[in-house]
Amino acid sequence: MYIRFFLIVALFCTFTTYAYEVKRIRRHIQKPVSPTKDSFYVPKEGWEKAKPGTILASRKIQAGFTERRKIHLDGAYQLLYRTSGVDDKSPSFTVTTVLVPKNARTNKLVMVMPYEDSNFVDCAPSYKIQLGAPNEVNPIQSVEELMWTSILNDGWILTLPDHQGPLSAFSSSFIHGHASLDALRATLNFDTLKLQPDDPIVGIGYSGGAMAGGWAASLHDSYASELNVVGWALGGTPSNLTGTFRGVNGGLFAGFSVAGIAGLVDSYPEVNDYIGSVITPAGNDALQYTREHCMMGIVVGLQNVNMTLDSFVSNGNTLLTDKKIAPLL
C-alpha cells in the first residue's frame, strides 16, 4: 500500500515538474499552427507526379521534449513528402519529423512510429512534438519520449512519421505501411543529414506504432526493397484487427474499436458506403468523436461503448463480416 502511494506521489511530482517546465519555456516561444490550419501540410500543385519518398517541402522546428529533457540537437526538421494511400497507385502525402542529435552518427537511421491512435488530424505527432503545442505533455506521450530520448542520447538520427496520413486514418493498414516506408525514403533523401541510400535502418513501434511497423515490414520487399532495413522492434502489436476489435469493444478501451472503424471509413469509399447503410445517428456520433479528440479523449469519452449494439448499428455482431470490410481486417 505504501509503495503504491509513494509511486503515485512520485509520478505526480514528475509530471508536475514537466508541466511547470513546459509553462516556463512557452512564455518565450510562439505557439505552432495546427495541421488543419498550417499551409505546410498542404502540398503544392502537381505533387501527385512525384515519386514516393520525394520531399515536397521542409522546415526547421523546435521540439518540445528535447527542450524539457535538455537534449542538445544539431537540428530538428519536418519533411512533407509524397507517399501512397491504400495502394501504390493512390498518391498521398504526409509529414515526418527528423531529430538530429549533437555529434550524430550519420551512417545509421532509426525510425519510431509513434502511437497516435486517434482520427483527429490535429493529434498528428508532427504537431504535438512541437514546442508550445497544446497537449504537448501528457502521461502517455511522456512514456514514449523516454525511448526517443534514449535513441538521441546514443547519437542516432531519429525520424518520426505521421504514419496515419493526411486524414489520420487509424488502423488503415496500407496507409500506415506506405507512409512509414516513404518516411525512410524522404529522410534518406534529405541532403542536410548526409545519409547514404544504403545506410542501415531500424524501425521501432509500440501499440498503434507497432501496427504501422508490422505493415511496413510486410510491405518492405514489395514496395521499398531498396531500403536497407536490418531489423524491426515491435511490441503490443494488434496483428488481428478483428480479434482486437472484439477484445476491446464494450470495455475500457472501446474507443479504439470505434477509431478503427472510422479509419477504414475514411480510407475506403466502399467501407464508407457500407457503414453508412447500417450505422445509426448515435453510431455516427461515436465515429465523429474520434475525429475530434486525441487518444486520451477517445479512451475516456468512449469507454464501454459497444459498437455492435442496435443503438449504434443495425447489423450487430455481423458488422465486421461483410465482404466490403472483412478483407481489410
Model-found features: residue ranges?
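Catalytic-loop region of hydrolases
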Residues: 19-105
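Alpha/beta-hydrolase active-site loop
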Residues: 170-192
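Conserved alpha/beta-hydrolase
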Residues: 114, 129-167
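Accessory cap/linker subdomain of secreted extracellular hydrolases
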Residues: 45, 235-328
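Fungal secretory targeting signals
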Residues: 1-19
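Primarily recognizes the serine-hydrolase "nucleophile elbow" in alpha/beta-hydrolase
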Residues: 185-255
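Loop/turn elements at helix/coil->beta-strand transitions in domains of secreted/extracellular proteins
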Residues: 90, 105-110, 154-159, 198-201, ...
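Short beta-strand element of the alpha/beta-hydrolase
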Residues: 106-118, 127
